[in-house]
């Protein structure tokens, strides 16, 4: 994500110069959002390591929409939880749980570490929600989406990249590793978040984070098509519920 942040800055440099004065008016929000963005992957991956991939994934992904709508209700004028959002959220969370736990196995993690992992999962969801809410707020106040994300990712990268000194020992050890890093930086972290920022121009942060529940569905589809894995019936049921969740979100939009 740190390398992807530099890519975001490079792509948005012209727009950043254009919106520089507007950005300066939101220094506090940008700082909070950059810290949240940098902390998100650290909390997310640590949660999966300590609590298990299934539990860490479910908590991190499922709590982000909840925290996002909570931030909107507390700090954004005229925003409230709608029945449509609540229904979509409930269906989506049920789908995520079925999909992820359909292939999970019993964990042998020490209980105290597992609790820490669960807590980190909640923190990851909160960090992602903070980033999304701040980005949406900046866009609503006249900052272009490309500038908002470029600035947030740029400052986030300055915080995140030094962690490579501790965690990135083998990151560039082989050609394969370098290609994977390049792909992750350019496609998911670069183009993916550009698309996410563009979407924030038209939907709320809570709706955008809810739509990202589609991410595990794509991962499951790639696992079947590319890797040749099989998904149990319970997992397919979860995918169906997630698709229903998305249909509820886009209905009448």
Where does each model-flagged region fall?
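Specific transmembrane alpha-helical segments of multi-pass solute transporters/efflux pumps
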Residues: 12-56, 60, 98, 185-203
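Juxtamembrane helix-entry segments on the extracytoplasmic side of multipass membrane proteins
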Residues: 22-26, 101-127, 165-183, 230-240
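Helix-helix packing/entry segments at the starts of transmembrane helices
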Residues: 56-63, 134-157, 189-225
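Transmembrane alpha-helices of multi-pass small-molecule transport proteins
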Residues: 1-39, 65-71, 127-131, 149-167, ...
């Amino acid at each position: 994500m740190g390398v992807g942040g530099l890519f975001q800055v490079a792509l948005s440099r012209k727009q950043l110069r254009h919106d520089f004065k507007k950005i300066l008016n939101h220094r506090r929000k940008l700082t909070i959002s950059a810290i949240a963005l940098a902390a998100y992957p650290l909390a997310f991956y640590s949660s999966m390591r300590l609590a298990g991939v299934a539990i860490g994934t479910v908590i991190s992904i499922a709590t982000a929409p909840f925290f996002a709508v909570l931030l909107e209700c507390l700090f954004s004028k005229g925003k409230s939880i709608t029945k449509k959002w609540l229904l979509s959220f409930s269906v989506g969370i049920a789908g995520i749980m079925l999909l992820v736990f359909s292939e999970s196995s019993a964990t042998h993690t020490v209980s105290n570490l597992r609790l820490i992992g669960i807590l980190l999962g909640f923190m990851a969801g909160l960090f992602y929600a903070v980033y999304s809410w701040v980005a949406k707020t900046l866009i609503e106040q006249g900052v272009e989406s490309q500038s908002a994300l470029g600035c947030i990712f740029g400052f986030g990268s300055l915080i995140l990249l030094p962690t490579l000194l501790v965690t990135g020992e083998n990151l560039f050890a082989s050609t394969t590793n370098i290609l994977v890093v390049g792909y992750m930086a350019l496609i998911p972290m670069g183009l993916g978040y550009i698309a996410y920022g563009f979407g924030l121009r038209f939907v709320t942060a809570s709706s955008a984070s809810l739509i990202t529940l589609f991410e595990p569905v794509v991962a499951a589809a790639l696992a079947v098509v590319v890797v040749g894995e099989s998904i149990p019936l319970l997992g397919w049921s979860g995918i169906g519920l997630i698709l229903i969740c998305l249909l509820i979100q886009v209905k009448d939009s």
